[in-house]
Amino acid sequence: MSSQDIHSEKQHHIDMKRGDVAPTVLIPGDPGRVTLFAALMDEAKKVAENREYITYTGKKDGVPISCTSTGLGCPPTAIGVEELIRIGAKNIIRIGTCGAIQPFLAPGHMII
């Protein structure tokens, strides 16, 4: 199989193909958060649901955007990110909660 085939085929885990996602994709871990973000989009459409990976694609202020859940932990996130890149995602932004051990980071701080 050539790399061109890999990039044009439906991806096994996220169940999407090229054209299903916008160039910018938000990736929360929790699948429940995807519907919250979809409610903030214009023209939101559910394009896939497979295992922990749920995706909506729409627009925000006229800009195409997608939101795909990845589940918890590094392995499913890595799988999701690799497959999203194969089908055209260019900007992937992880959103959600995290922990920190630095004393200057209090609950509620935004970490980028």
Regions found by a protein language model. Give the residues of each.
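Metabolite-binding pocket within alpha/beta catalytic cores that recognizes anionic/polar moieties
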Residues: 2-112
